[in-house]
Amino acid sequence: PIYSEGEVLSAWLNEQAAEESLPRALYYNSISLHDGNQLAGRSRMNSLESYPARQQRLFADIAQFISQLEREGRNVMLVVVPEHGAALKGDKLQFAGLREIPSPAIVSVPAAVKFIGPDIKHSELYEVEKTVSYFALSELISNAMKWDAFSGAVNVQRLVDSLPSAAKVAENQDTVMMYIKGQPYIQLDGAEWTKYPDN
């Protein structure tokens, strides 16, 4: 069992501190918010009931990890990308907690990027409001390296202004959801396209 994401991340960071300060990357797949997880020491709850507590704990663990990274004094680009939404609310096509149909609420998730380092001088939050994809994240990472985002001289707005936008499209084995003229449409099992119903 994993009782704390913070403990896992902290242990990794402590291992790195003992080694030479070479560049490194960590890909960490958090499982705190996955369906079916249970909270240790508490009575059994379904995923929707336990989600608020699990979410709060995950954000606290991430905040703790950021504080540790800041104390290290190294240059770090922290990227947090949800796999998908949690379907906390149902709609006319599926119940809360189900993700069989890639609804707009499930596939529209925020991602976060934080630059940490001794020469980082910006602290403002910049929000990208246009629809972007994983390609935009890779572009952001590339630009950060190309323009040396850790020098303290790079305007973060410059990093995000040039990100490519993307059409909102999602697909699984039997279903396709995409936006047409600003409205979500869905195709189930290869049938006719229909507008995704409003709640």
Task: Show the residue positions of the predicted features.
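Generic enzyme active-site microenvironment
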Residues: V80-V81
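Catalytic-adjacent loop/helix segments of enzymes that bind and process anionic phosphate/sulfate esters
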Residues: P1-R71, L88-D91, R99-F135
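Membrane-interface soluble catalytic domains
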Residues: N14-E15, S67-G73, K92, R99-P102, ...
